[in-house]
UniProtKB/Swiss-Prot annotation:
Catalyzes the attachment of threonine to tRNA(Thr) in a two-step reaction: L-threonine is first activated by ATP to form Thr-AMP and then transferred to the acceptor end of tRNA(Thr). Also edits incorrectly charged L-seryl-tRNA(Thr). Homodimer. This is Threonine--tRNA ligase. Residues 237-528 are annotated as: Catalytic. It catalyses: tRNA(Thr) + L-threonine + ATP = L-threonyl-tRNA(Thr) + AMP + diphosphate + H(+). The keyword Ligase applies. It is found in: Cytoplasm. Binds 1 zinc ion per subunit. GO terms for biological process: threonyl-tRNA aminoacylation. GO terms for molecular function: ATP binding; metal ion binding; threonine-tRNA ligase activity; tRNA binding. GO terms for cellular component: cytoplasm. Residues 1-58 form the TGS domain. Belongs to the class-II aminoacyl-tRNA synthetase family. It comes from Chlamydia trachomatis serovar L2 (strain ATCC VR-902B / DSM 19102 / 434/Bu).
Length: 635
């Protein structure tokens, strides 16, 4: 007999029992898609060992959902091969919104989707058991996939000692690490979304492939809800709204590097000004470090060795330089400009740094995935004893910032990876427990992702939920035990000795560009007044009303209200529609009556009309709405 633990409960099982046997014993096997066995993702068919700790995964768990979608990608490949036997499957990973599979020697269009979906449904209904097999060696794997040069190339690149596995469902076998569902049966709702071209390994010099995107769910109801969400997402697409509202544009001369227009810069500046006020109140000092620094710096930080392919490099005066992809190394150099004592800690240093990272052209997407962006970093230097309290301070800052935008969020604690980490076991345990205690004290929901931390320390990721319930990973809090050592940072401790500080690296917006894209979609372009690129538009009925309109515009502008005048020859109704299409918060119409009474006729973008409003009253209401950072209109 063996003894295992699941949900802090002990179970006794016969030798050779699998995770599925344990699930059956718990009478919940129908709910489970996979398992974490000693923090490692495994199939339910995995044989358990004495002393194992098991955590079952369901569709509702992020890792469980990945397993479900991964199996769905295999179903897609199997369906395509049944219909087009000469197609060559390459890779089929899980992505944020579903999965895709790339094929060579295949030419299809979306007109073929119904046939593929019908075949996928058949495969699911056939309830094929999914089994894992391990090749005895690399030669055996290469021999099996000798007719597929893409799979053979992947196998050839693997180290000799790596276990090479494949998964079988019915007649289909695919090279894969897994894990997978126990069978194809749970995939009851399957939908293909689109196709695109792709290059093998993202390299334009390599073979051209066709990529098929899809989603899947355990129930038809969930699929319908998801498709409805996708339709709503199309209406909110920040790339479309960004153009319509004249916020930003993309130019072919600089792919992945957006041009912000005057209206977009108003929103940008409102975000940055708010960020600066928030951080000044929280005790942060702001710095600015260069964008261009030499190779020596990036060798110390480790970027030159491990990240160079994502950096823009150049040679100046026969010396190698790189445009910074991250702000951290520059802050390390700033720290070293002065001597430091434990009495200064926590030392909070913030920077909105302009960074550049080379992304493949196929990965670029509006403001969400770019090659240049501004990261709102901060580095907090502290002693090990201060980690918990300072993490809680940062979490409170997170709550205030996202609350200002009406955004809900959840937190994810990623713990120590199995291999390749730095730092002692004791320091990792101290750091992880400190972050965990801070999360508990914050009273915000969080999940733990075992083994998903960085090599230099545990981290907390912040996942924001928008108006249509999509989640976006924005901010992060990372405990870094690596860079302070690499840069030989020191402080004088309470005993008068030199010590290396612990560093909390955190970003709240993450990327300002990406956060702005999220806000455009969250608000559907209808920004609250304090973020709006145009607070008020004054509309004239006739030419004789323009002088009064300009007088009012000057009055409002001097108060800090962003205002414009539309004295064009368009009809009043057309001017109002134009303003509403541009999501102007308030419109003021000036006609003969308003000219005579000096009162205002105000219309909101939701078409609420308020007549005979005094200028002073309107000004007071608007200024208070701006000051309070209100998310709802005051009129």
């Amino acid at each position: 007999m063996i003894h295992v633990t699941c949900n802090q409960e002990a179970f006794e099982l016969p030798e050779g029992a699998s995770a599925m046997d344990l699930a059956n014993k718990m009478k919940q096997s129908h709910c489970f898609v996979g398992a974490l066995i000693n923090d490692q993702e495994k199939d339910l068919s995995t044989t358990l060992q004495d002393g194992d700790t098991v955590l079952f995964l369901t569709w509702d768990d992020p890792k469980g959902r990945e397993i479900f979608l991964h199996t769905s990608a295999h179903i897609l490949a199997q369906a395509v091969l049944r219909l087009w036997p000469s197609a060559q499957p390459t890779i089929g990973p899980v992505i944020d919104q579903g999965f895709y599979y790339d094929f060579a020697n295949l030419s299809i269009s979306e007109e073929d989707f119904p046939a593929i979906e019908a075949m996928a449904k058949t495969i699911a209904e056939e309830k094929f058991p999914i089994s894992r097999q391990v090749f005895p060696d690399k030669e055996a794997a290469l021999a099996y996939f000798s007719q597929n040069p893409f799979k053979a190339e992947l196998i050839a690149e693997l180290p000799e000692e790596v276990e090479i596995s494949a998964y079988t469902q019915g007649e289909f076998l695919d090279l894969c690490r897994g894990p997978h569902l126990p069978s194809t049966a749970p995939v009851k709702a399957f939908k293909l979304l689109r196709t695109s071209s792709a290059y093998w390994k993202g390299d334009p010099s390599r073979e051209s492939l066709i990529r098929i995107y899809g989603v899947s769910f355990p129930t038809t109801k969930e699929l319908k809800e998801h498709l409805h969400q996708l339709e709503e997402a199309k209406k909110r697409d920040h790339r479309v709204l960004g153009t319509k509202l004249d916020l930003f544009s993309q130019q072919t001369c600089s792919a992945g590097m957006p041009f912000f227009h005057p209206r977009g810069m108003v929103v940008w500046n409102a975000l940055v000004d708010y960020w600066k006020r928030l951080h000044q109140r929280a005790g942060y000092q702001q710095i600015q470090t260069p964008q261009l620094m030499n190779r020596e710096l990036w060798e110390i930080s480790g970027h030159w060795e491990n990240y160079k392919e994502n950096m823009y490099t150049l040679t100046v005066d026969e010396e190698d330089y790189a445009i910074k992809p991250m702000n951290c190394p520059g802050c390390m150099l700033y720290y070293k400009t002065q001597l430091h004592s434990y009495r200064e800690f926590p030392l909070r240093i913030a920077e909105i740094g302009h960074v550049h990272r080379h992304e493949l052209s196929g990965a670029l997407s509006g403001l969400m995935r770019v090659r240049t962006f501004h990261q709102d970093d901060a580095h907090v230097f502290l002693t090990p004893e201060q980690v918990e309290e300072e993490t809680l301070n940062i979490l409170n800052l997170v709550s205030e910032l996202y609350g200002t935008f009406g955004l809900e969020y959840h937190l994810e604690l990623s713990t120590r990876p199995e291999q390749g980490t730095i730092g002692s076991d004791d320091l990792w345990e101290l750091a992880t427990e400190a972050l965990k205690r801070a999360l508990v004290k914050s009273q915000k929901p969080f999940i733990i992702s075992p083994g998903e931390g960085a090599f230099y320390g545990p981290k907390i990721d912040i996942h924001v939920k928008d108006a249509i319930n999509r989640t976006w990973q924005c901010g992060t809090i990372q405990l870094d035990m690596f860079l302070p050592e690499r840069f030989d940072l020191k402080y004088t401790n309470a005993q008068g000795e030199k010590s290396t500080p612990i560093m909390l690296h955190r970003a709240l917006f993450g990327s300002i560009e990406r956060f702005l894209g999220i806000l455009i979609e969250h608000f559907k372009g209808r920004f609250p007044l304090w973020l709006s690129p145009e607070h008020v538009r004054i509309i004239t009925v006739a030419d004789r009303h323009e002088a009064r309109a300009q007088e009012l515009a000057k009055h409002f502008s001097q108060m800090g209200i962003i205002v414009s005048v539309d004295s064009s020859n368009e009809s009043v109704s057309k001017k109002i529609r134009n303003a509403q299409n541009m999501q102007v918060n308030y419109m003021i119409t000036i006609g003969d009556k308003e000219l005579e009474t000096h009162l205002l006729a105000v219309r909101t973008r939701d078409n609420r009309v308020l007549n005979d409003i005094a200028v002073e009253q309107f000004s007071h209401v608007i200024l208070e709405e701006l000051r309070s950072l209100s998310l709802t209109p005051s009129l």
